[in-house]
Structures are given as C-alpha cells and as structure tokens.
Regions:
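Short histidine-centered catalytic/ligand-binding loop motif
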Residues: 43, 82-85, 161-179, 223
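Hydrophobic/aromatic-lined pockets within catalytic cores
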Residues: 58-62, 152-155, 193-197, 244
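Metal-dependent nuclease catalytic regions and adjoining charged, substrate-binding loops involved
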Residues: 97, 175-182, 187-278
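Secondary-structure boundary elements
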Residues: 111-112, 141-149, 192-200
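Short, flexible loop/turn elements at secondary-structure junctions
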Residues: 122-128, 141-143, 152-154, 259
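Coil-to-beta-strand transition motifs
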Residues: 130-134, 141, 145, 199, ...
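Conserved catalytic cores of phosphodiester-cleaving nucleases, focusing on short active-site segments
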Residues: 135-171, 188
Length: 278
C-alpha cells in the first residue's frame, strides 16, 4: 500500500478509519452507499467546523491559518453587524480557545515541556484482526509515553440519562460512550503499540460549548478502553468484508437512507413496536 502522508491521508481508502468504521456500525447499507457515491449526506457542518477550528488553533499557527483560508467563507459573516467576524455559531470557539490557551495544566499536557518530543496530528496505522486501520492523533508525547485527544462537547457535568448505564450521569460520560471514544482511544493505543512497541496512556482534554466553557482532563480506565477495542475487534472483519464487496451490506431500516429505500409490504402491530429494539 502507498505510504500514508498528511497530503494523502484523507484520500487513501485502502485503510479503515475509526469514523468510517462507526458509519458502518450505525448502518452498513448507508455507509456503503456513501462510499459508492449513491447517497450524499445532508447534515449540519457546524459541529465539525467548530471542532476543527479549535483543534487547528492548538496544532500550530500555520495549521489554523490554513484552516481559515480553506473554510473562512463558512465561518465568517458576510453581512450585518458581524460582517468579517465569526458567525454567532462559531464565537463560542474563541471562548473555548481562550479557556485553554493560558491554562498551564493544559499546555504542559498538550504541548509538553521544551525538552519533550511532541508530535501533533501524528498518523498511526496497523492491523486489527487482519484489517488495515489508520488514525490521526491530536498530540503525542513520545518522551513521556502518552497521547491526548481534544474533544469539544455540549457540557461536561450537566446531568443526562444514560440508556447504557441506566442512570443519570455527567454529560461527558454519554459523550464518550455514545460516540465510542473509549473504543477510539483503545484503538489508537493499540496502533501506537504496534508502531513503537510501547504502551501509551490516553487522555481526553474535554472543553464544553457552554457560554462560559468548562474544561477537564479525563483519563479512560483500562477496562473501558479494552471493552471499546474488543467491540471494534468483534465487528471489524464483517465491516471490511462489506467494504470489499464480499458481503452484502445490512440495512438498519431506520436511518434516512433506509427510509428513502423503504417499501410498505407488511403491517406492524403495536406489540411489535413495544417489543422492538429500536
């Protein structure tokens, strides 16, 4: 396979990424249709752009400027009193940056000490159950053996109901478990070990999108990392077989793509609805 670089990382489809894997977890049929170009996702780009706006700032001045050059039209207001400045949806991004940039604990963790070897946006790769997998890490401290993932989230401590844990939990718990970040970090830890032969400690720097952003350094316990990676291992071969055309993609029957393909050929009873897993 072609060597992975910053230039070809997003174009090379010979490797599976965590985000692409999660699309297939949600609905194989939709993910396959997206890959083939049969289906085009209509979604709000704001959360992704906001996250990348914050990420690029802490990567480097050059990375942030490049991001603004490529996406400025989407982030900057063209009319009104904010013309030339950030749109209201992205003003919180500056608040999130301000909350972190002068925080000594964050800077020590994310950027390391002057003598540390720290790499930003490090490409990692390897094989999971024989499937080629790649990823990009926000910040890796090669000197001290840890890596950091910067996550923007609605809130860290506001209480929410967790369907998985069946109790109220801080919002960060739902964010991590629902988006599978424990699996993502477990995966990246495994890929780093394959590349370096060393065990790295993963951390999340969480920053909230609240009017006054909250922030926290989170450590995912080993049992959660292992559980998340085990789930990926249990499903990744089937996903790769679907991608390669060796297996027909399954429909979830409930996403927008599946609804677009739906034909009314059966009657659903009230008890069917009550007993369904959906």
């Amino acid at each position: 396979m072609e060597e992975l670089t910053q230039e070809n990382y997003y174009q090379d489809r010979n490797w599976l990424t965590n985000s692409r894997f999660k699309q297939y977890q949600q609905c194989q049929a939709k993910a396959f249709a997206l890959d083939s170009g049969e289906w085009v996702e209509e979604r709000d780009e704001t959360p992704l752009l906001l996250g990348n706006y914050v990420h690029s700032y802490f990567e480097s001045e050059e990375a942030h400027q490049q991001f603004m050059d490529e996406n400025g039209e989407k982030l900057l207001a063209k009319t009104g009193k904010n013309k030339g400045n950030l749109k209201s949806d992205f003003v919180i991004g500056d608040k999130m940056i301000e909350s972190l940039k002068d925080d000594e604990g964050f800077n020590r963790l994310y950027h390391g000490y002057s003598s540390d070897e720290v790499q930003k946006e490090l490409i990692v790769y390897g094989k999971i159950e024989g499937v080629p997998v790649k990823g990009k890490l926000d910040s890796v401290n090669l000197s001290r053996g840890y890596f950091v993932d910067l996550k923007t989230m609605k809130s860290i401590y506001s209480e929410e109901w967790s369907a998985e844990l069946k109790k109220k939990v801080p919002a960060a718990v739902n964010n991590i478990l629902n988006f599978g970040y424990h699996g993502q970090l477990g995966l990246y830890r495994e890929l780093l070990k394959q590349m370096t032969g060393k065990d790295f400690r993963p951390y999340i720097v969480a920053v909230s999108k609240e009017a006054v952003p909250d922030r926290e350094i989170l450590k995912i316990d080993d049992e959660w990392l292992e559980e998340g990676l085990d789930k990926i291992k249990s499903e990744i071969v089937e996903v790769w077989d679907v991608i390669q055309g060796k297996q027909k993609p399954k429909k979830c029957e409930h996403c927008d793509y599946c609804r677009s393909q739906k034909k009314l050929n059966a009657v659903v009873t009230l008890n069917d609805l009550i007993e369904s897993d959906y």
